[in-house]
Amino acid sequence: MSCLNLIKSVIVLIFLVPVLSYANQSQNVPYYGDDFYQDLKTGTSNIQLRERLKRIFNSVHQVRANGNDVIGPKGCKGECYQHTPTGYTAARVFLMGNFYLVKNGREYSVHDVYCDKDLSREDFKGAPPAPGRIPDNRVINVEHTWPQSRFTKRYSDEMQKSDLHHLFPTDSQLNSIRGNKIFGEVTQDLIDLKCSASRFGVGSAGSEEVFEPPQDHKGNVARALFYFAVRYEMEIDPQEEAVLRKWHREDPIDQEERVRNEEIFKAQKTRNPFIDFPELVERIANF
């Protein structure tokens, strides 16, 4: 092997090691417990899989050294945890004052996922982006990917409103335009939006108005809605679901989405299984 080829091989190995380490870790996440992994082996699907995930979401978890969590133990001993809502204010700080905050020298900007751009101090008349702060909501706000008007009564509004897995920072105007419309692929624009990354108009399946996010956010939207439907025992509109399944395939999970899932777990102690195990989408026939 030439010296140049050897150097190239070493460089490739350096970049592959962390990726492979993460891939191995994601295949054995203690959060899900032993029974879940048995379900994976036996091909559990549909209602049974949803019920398994619901139990994982709703139960107390007991941490087990060098093993998977004990799900719903009788009398928890040692280190235990369960889904703990952060509250909506803390959720907004997490997103816009932390995870999506970008440092540029001495200045900060915050990433808007609907226009797919970073908004800096110059874009704000009020409070600008800064660590641990919520910037001017007339410029950027938090989008509830599952609209608040469609929340279930089975769980508290506050739990659903502050669940970080379906929250993203978006341009306030586009947030308002999207409203509670379903997601879809636009065939005829009804409004010229301020940025071309997103579209609003007539959907490909008919006359219903739909909102179409940027290409590199479509898979994120799909997996957020799959999570929310299972977590809170709700159903996704069939027309919307067909598009979401397509987006899940076309915009696969990237490193940022994996890191976000980890950080959300640290903050509220729940994970999105459709990020950890994207193949689960194919095991559920109807969301």
Predicted features by range, described:
Residues M1-I11:
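Bacterial N-terminal signal peptides that target proteins for export
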Residues V10-P18:
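Bacterial N-terminal signal peptides
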Residues V17, S120, T145-Q148:
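Generic N-terminal helix/loop capping motif
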Residues S21-D118, L280-F287:
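N-terminal module-boundary/linker segments of secreted carbohydrate-active enzymes
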Residues Y108-D112, K117-V139:
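Short, His- and charge-rich active-site/binding loops that engage polyanionic ligands
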Residues P129-F287:
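Domain-level detector of nuclease and nuclease-like folds
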